């Protein structure tokens, strides 16, 4: 049933976007739009107020799989676990989806995972956590991650510019850097999130929760990547901003 509900929500979003395009792009009044569509102005108001926002399409149609790494323990029993910051990022993603009428389907990413699940997906995973993270970054023509000088960096593949986590500076600063890409893959969307540390991933979601609409208006349905710096109070993100991008592919 979730699939059908998500399709219905997407159809409502498309109706709302078409109405707004006619109003803003063509200069029609809502009364004129209602007349052209053969519906009442009240129905137009209902569509505008009740349908999901246009930026819902950033993540696809839904339901959306939301994956985080399953890490290997280092104690005697070698139990697998999910990092607290990764779990918080997964929860932040689900919270954001709640504002967009998107259904989330959480999953874990074992360390040997190389295949992206079918359908719309948010992969919260760095290149060192699983092959799926490394492969997605490898296919990004603009940004990636490299290990140099004993630490990890986000790299602009075209210029060689490096963006490191302030938390690994000497002295360390309460901040981190995260990576975000969004790509159209046939009839689905793959969003990839990765931090230099796991807190960097949460910084990406902090930014999306506050700037998704403006980012979607800038990038539309194009594939792109960007880097985000976030300020931290322990594991809590207090601010976030773009430091590179968005770079359209």
Annotated model-derived regions:
Residues 5, 51-52:
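Cysteine-dependent phosphatase catalytic core of the protein tyrosine phosphatase
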Residues 43-45, 58:
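Boundary/activation segment at the start of structured domains
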């Amino acid at each position: 049933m979730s699939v059908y509900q998500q399709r219905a929500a997407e159809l409502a979003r498309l109706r709302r976007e078409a109405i707004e395009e006619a109003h803003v792009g063509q200069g029609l009044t809502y009364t004129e739009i209602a007349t052209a569509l053969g519906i009442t102005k009240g129905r137009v108001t209902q569509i505008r107020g009740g349908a999901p926002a246009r930026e819902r399409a950033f993540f696809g149609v839904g339901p959306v799989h939301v994956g985080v790494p399953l890490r290997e323990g280092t104690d005697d029993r070698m139990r697998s676990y999910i990092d607290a910051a990764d779990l918080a990022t997964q929860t932040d993603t689900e919270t954001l989806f709640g504002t967009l009428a998107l259904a989330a389907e959480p999953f874990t990413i074992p360390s040997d995972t190389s295949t992206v699940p079918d359908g719309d997906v948010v992969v919260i995973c760095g290149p060192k956590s699983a092959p799926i993270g490394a492969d997605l970054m490898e296919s990004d023509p603009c940004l990636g991650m490299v290990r140099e000088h004993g630490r990890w960096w986000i790299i602009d593949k075209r210029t060689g510019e490096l963006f490191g986590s302030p938390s690994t500076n000497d002295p360390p600063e309460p901040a981190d850097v995260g990576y975000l890409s969004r790509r159209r893959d046939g009839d689905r969307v793959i969003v990839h999130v990765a931090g230099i540390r796991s807190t960097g991933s949460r910084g990406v979601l902090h930014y999306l929760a506050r700037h998704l609409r403006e980012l979607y208006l800038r990038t539309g349905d194009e594939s792109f990547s960007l880097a985000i710096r976030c300020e931290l109070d322990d594991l809590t993100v207090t601010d976030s901003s773009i430091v590179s991008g968005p770079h359209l592919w």
